[in-house]
UniProtKB/Swiss-Prot annotation:
Pfam families, sorted: RecO_C, RecO_N
Name by which UniProt lists this protein: DNA repair protein RecO
Keywords: DNA damage, DNA recombination, DNA repair
Keyword field contains Disulfide bond: no
Organism lineage string: Bacteria, Bacillati, Actinomycetota, Actinomycetes, Frankiales
Role, per record: Involved in DNA repair and RecF pathway recombination.
GO BP terms: DNA recombination; double-strand break repair
GO CC annotations, alphabetized: bacterial nucleoid
Superkingdom of this protein's organism: Bacteria
Coiled coil: none
Family: Belongs to the RecO family.
SUPFAM superfamilies in the cross-refs: ArfGap/RecO-like zinc finger, Nucleic acid-binding proteins
InterPro entries given in the database record: ARFGAP/RecO (IPR037278), DNA_rep/recomb_RecO_N (IPR022572), NA-bd_OB-fold (IPR012340), RecO (IPR003717), RecO_C (IPR042242)
């Protein structure tokens, strides 16, 4: 397909030569693609600010050997620009975008569920109706789940025994019962486990009544679990502001 149309979220940009940029986009149908936007850094560029990180765009692209080329871009929703005015939301979005890129390790592999989660997460951040940290943690847990790394929260990750288990093994895949608890497993609070479970299944009524301590603990667990499966840290995570 020499020329194709797709919609996607801009994950990252990088300068190329004097006036161009390489953009990385998670698309609805094609998965993660990289493409050159020629002349985008010129003040007279026809693309304007349409290809900034976090922007949801409709794209017309020309396929290339190593990189595609953007020939047309129209904004569907300027999530990135809306979110950027608020630092906690901006840093949460930055972690989302980097996570989406890292979870799509291969280019041109469709990842529709991850794409829909990312669009939904950015839309929620832009709406500013829920705490950014909770929106981020919900995205991280669900993104890991659709990528095959779901965290066990309502049953033992080892034996499958149901219940509210208060030991966590990140390498083991989630909470574990007393009989299966491995050496080095961490103790976690019931509030944090319940909050993580609420976020994973989208129970916002339950999540929003959680207290600040449970939110901090749950956020740390979600970040640790993510980075374990990514096998290295996220560049954006140290800048995250959990307001």
């Amino acid at each position: 397909m020499p020329v194709y149309r797709d919609e996607g979220v801009v994950l990252r940009t990088a300068p190329l030569a004097e006036a161009d940029r390489i953009i990385t986009v998670l698309t609805r149908r094609t998965g993660r693609v990289r493409a050159v936007a020629k002349g985008v850094r010129k003040t007279s560029s026809r693309f304007g600010s349409r290809l900034e990180p976090g922007t949801y765009v409709d794209l017309l692209l020309h396929s290339g050997r190593a990189l595609d080329t953007v020939t047309q871009a129209d904004i569907i929703s300027p999530y990135g620009a809306t979110i950027a005015v608020d630092y906690p939301r901006y840093t949460a979005a930055a972690v989302m975008l980097e996570t989406a890129e890292r979870l799509t390790s291969e280019e041109r592999q469709p990842a529709l569920r991850l794409f829909l989660l990312l669009v939904g997460g950015l839309r929620t951040l832009a709406g500013d109706e829920r705490p950014p940290a909770l929106v981020l943690d919900a995205f991280l847990l669900r993104a890991l789940a659709v990528s095959g790394y779901g965290m066990a929260l309502d049953h033992c990750a080892r034996c499958g025994g149901p219940g509210l288990h208060l030991s966590l093994s990140v390498p083991g895949g989630g909470v574990v019962c007393p009989q299966c608890r491995p050496h080095g497993a961490a103790s976690v609070s019931a509030g944090a486990v319940r909050l993580l479970a609420d976020l994973l299944r989208g129970d916002w009524d339950g999540a929003l009544v959680s207290d600040a301590r449970a939110r901090r603990e749950a956020g740390g667990i979600a970040a640790a679990y993510l980075q374990w499966h990514l096998e290295r840290g996220l560049r954006a995570l140290p800048y995250l502001e959990r307001a």
